[in-house]
Amino acid sequence: EIAEKLGISRRYVTQLLKPLIDEDIVKRSYVVDMKKYDEVYGSSDPNFNSKQNSAYSLVENMLRNMADHVKSEVELSFESILNNDNDMAERALELDFTTNNMFEKVRSTVDAVVSVNPHFKLSKIILFNEAAYNYERIGDYSGHIAKFVINDETPVDDELLAILKKMHKYAQKSISYATDAFINGELELRGDLMDCEEKMHEKQENAMAKIAGQMAETSFDDVEKSNYYIYISRVVKSFERIGDISVE
């Protein structure tokens, strides 16, 4: 039940519960001795421990800001392709440095909270590190999108660009759905998120088929065009990975 509620594996739950099992607070069958729990960690009433609530709010706000920042990073990266604009691509890459710093801030904050109160090892707050790491990974793939403009001056043809626009739309929706589902507990959005992932994979297949068709018409001696196909394929893959990471 714990694994299902938090969306993590049973093995991970077992690892998290081990310290409490060793202290005989949680029985082997995972029956919690609430009296002993309160003696060791304070009241089990979620409204009692205001420090816990404030810690949640602090890190949740950091994650919301990180999600908004990453969406802006993806947006600017794709805008650089739409406009074939090197300066926009460079600015998008600069945003990724901020994304990395935001991840470190979330990680250090969670570590500090857990070190002060070991009870947090059993709470949702430990999953915030993983969520922040996933936002950082999305930022990395956004960087791959921006680097296309820096590495290649060839504008994307209209047909392929139309597919990429769809993939960008699904990527932005996926980030939003995942954030609302995780932070706000809007689990009903999981269906919408899975729909986005399915549509993303469909568009990825369409894009790669289009690229393969264009490659077949290109001479092997055309090195510049060959490099273009490598770079644009990375863009397609990056959008797909953003969708997959959002589901994670």
Language-model region placement:
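Cytosolic, long alpha-helical scaffolding segments
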Residues: 1-248
